[in-house]
From Swiss-Prot:
Pfam families: Ribosomal_L11, Ribosomal_L11_N. PANTHER family: 60S RIBOSOMAL PROTEIN L12, LARGE RIBOSOMAL SUBUNIT PROTEIN UL11M. It comes from the Bacteria. Coiled coil: none annotated. Forms part of the ribosomal stalk which helps the ribosome interact with GTP-bound translation factors. One or more lysine residues are methylated. NCBIfam families: L11_bact. This is Large ribosomal subunit protein uL11.
Length: 141
């Protein structure tokens, strides 16, 4: 029989830099999970993605064991890296703060495709394009 899931914890952590300090410690500690075991496993799994924020979904079971799934970095992080800027515009309707090419947009869409609720690369590109537009980043040919 399968183990019963007690809790699902969602966190967004720097790749390869998880430590027992907040937010990781308190979130896992209240469910009795071995915090250091999670940190070591997460850091090992994400060390090749250094510099990105990687969302993680942790399933905690009745016997206090856990499994976790890492997701792809948020689209906004990928877009700001591609555009070479710190952050998006606070007022996207008043002008752009940077731009990305169609090829960069396609690359980001391919990266995000497993986590998006679409099947084709074209629809994924439209989703990412909308995110970029809301951040004040224009798309060039």
């Amino acid at each position: 029989m399968a183990k019963k899931i007690v809790a699902v914890i969602k966190l967004a952590l720097q790749a390869g830099k998880a430590n027992p300090a907040p937010p990781v410690g308190p979130a896992l500690g209240q469910h009795g999970v071995n915090i250091m075991a999670f940190c070591k496993e997460y850091n090992a799994r994400t060390q090749d993605k250094a510099g990105f924020v990687i969302p993680v979904e942790i399933s905690v079971f009745e016997d206090r064991s856990f499994t976790f799934i890492t997701k792809t970095p948020p689209a906004s992080v990928l877009i700001t890296k591609a555009a070479g800027i710190e952050k998006g515009s606070g007022e996207s309707s008043k002008g752009s703060v940077g731009n990305i090419s169609k090829s960069q947009l396609e690359e980001i869409a391919k990266t995000k495709l497993p986590d998006l609720n679409c099947t084709s690369i074209e629809s994924a590109m439209k989703v990412i394009e909308g995110t970029a537009r809301n951040m004040g980043i224009s798309i060039t040919e």
